Amino acid sequence: MNLHEYQAKDLLESYGLKVQKGIVAHNPNEAAQAFDQLGGKFAVVKAQVHAGGRGKAGGVKVVKSSQEAREVAESLIGKNLVTFQTDAEGQPVNSVGVFEDVYPVTRELYLGAVVDRSSRKVTFMASTEGGVDIEEVAHNSPEKILKVEVDPLVGLQPFQAREVAFKLGLEGKQINDFVKTMLGAYKAFIECDFALFEINPLAVRENGEIVCVDGKINLDSNALYRHPKLLALRDKSQENAKELKASEHELNYVALKGNIGCMVNGAGLAMATMDIIQLYGGKPANFLDVGGGATKERVIEAFKLILDDENVKAVLINIFGGIVRCDMIAEAIIEAVKEVNVTVPVVVRLEGNNAEKGAKILADSGLKLIPADGLADAADKVVKSLG
């Protein structure tokens, strides 16, 4: 689950980090009032959306008066912002953040952390190349990114943060401020179950003060039951409507740009299914994992979700029966096909627990379903069904 910038900054500030002061505004008048309340000569109005690249897309503007703040807010709120990280429709802008002007600054740094699956540790990354896309830095100048793996038994130690500060070229009080920032960020990461966080840029002001000018936080969705206050910050308007609907039925769904709908149980099998569709010349329209303990109702909802995509011209159902019985899947498929007006070819491959029984149920249903014997046969048939 992603947080908006203003929410991320509020959370980081509660852990002792110095952040760029700001006020969220939901309409132009509130934006004008926020400018006056901040009391500076300048302010920065930023569209609050769950996407990067806002500046290049016109979602970040420097304003010099409350009237300018009102005008910029009016041009953003209620519109969709299209960036390199969004789809063609963009993300809806329901609010803007009006932030204090912290510039000029002497340096822009980068500080971030992720859960590194390979090392199974929280790994911090820091760089002198702040204010730019960190992926670009990693590609062009990987030597400019410092990495610190944190031992989960003892946590991030002050000496590790000091070492990073030295390598970033910080001096005097800046070192202590950076250590405080990094330690506070780690504490927030662990206590709030972050999956990812970034401060880009982490600015060094002319007076030596270190300030978080931006903030990006992604929370581990599997841990949200432990954080009801953070869950309350969820902005469903920023989420893909189909993916949101899928999550309500405990389905793992990701929309893609192909025309072959996929329903599979198990993430690994789902990825293998997408790969073999691609191998046979097809294009998957989605990733959809109904889970190892899929119920009849969940399968029906998954089928509806796939067919709700107008780009889907054929469907491949690939089920390996373990905990999930293939006969139950077969009954759910029949019920879903009867309930939804299916006008596209449906290829079904069942293997494992009660597979023969499931195949017989489908064969006796009288529905125009295409049985497949094996994964390769299923991929071949679904691609050929497109004509």
Curated annotation (Swiss-Prot):
One of its GO terms (cellular component) is cytosol. One of its GO terms (molecular function) is succinate-CoA ligase (ADP-forming) activity. Residues 9-245 form the ATP-grasp domain. GO terms for biological process: succinyl-CoA metabolic process; tricarboxylic acid cycle. Keywords: ATP-binding, Ligase, Magnesium, Metal-binding, Nucleotide-binding, Tricarboxylic acid cycle. Belongs to the succinate/malate CoA ligase beta subunit family. NCBIfam families: PRK00696.1, sucCoAbeta. Heterotetramer of two alpha and two beta subunits. This is Succinate--CoA ligase [ADP-forming] subunit beta. It comes from Francisella tularensis subsp. tularensis (strain WY96-3418).
